[in-house]
């Protein structure tokens, strides 16, 4: 079977737990793209740093880690499951729903 040259995924970035906005997009990405590529392609500004495990996203849309408590920061899930690998290591196959949210807010 011919390998598709592109995949389509949906992504939502949700900062509502910290009073920020939420945005969603449907993206067409090259085959072999990662969750990191999807974030980079969705048009939301973000900051990330390279670590020994891969790219670590520390800020999205101006909302940074640890702004709302020492454990607060961005997490992602794919099809409702939280992955324990860096977003730059999670290769997408197409059809996934990616959800980024700002977690562990201390009120």
Where are these regions (language model features)?
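Ubiquitin-like/PB1-type beta-grasp interaction modules and other compact soluble beta-rich domains
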Residues: 1-107
């Amino acid at each position: 079977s011919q390998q598709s040259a592109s995949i389509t995924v949906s992504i939502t970035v949700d900062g509502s737990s910290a009073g920020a906005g939420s945005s969603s997009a449907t993206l067409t990405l090259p085959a072999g793209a990662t969750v990191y590529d999807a974030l980079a392609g969705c048009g939301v500004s973000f900051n990330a740093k390279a670590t020994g495990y891969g790219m670590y996203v520390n800020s999205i849309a101006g909302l940074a880690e640890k702004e709302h408590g020492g454990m607060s920061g961005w997490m992602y899930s794919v099809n409702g499951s939280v992955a324990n690998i860096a977003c730059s290591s999670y290769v997408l196959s197409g059809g996934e729903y990616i959800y980024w949210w700002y977690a562990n807010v201390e009120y």
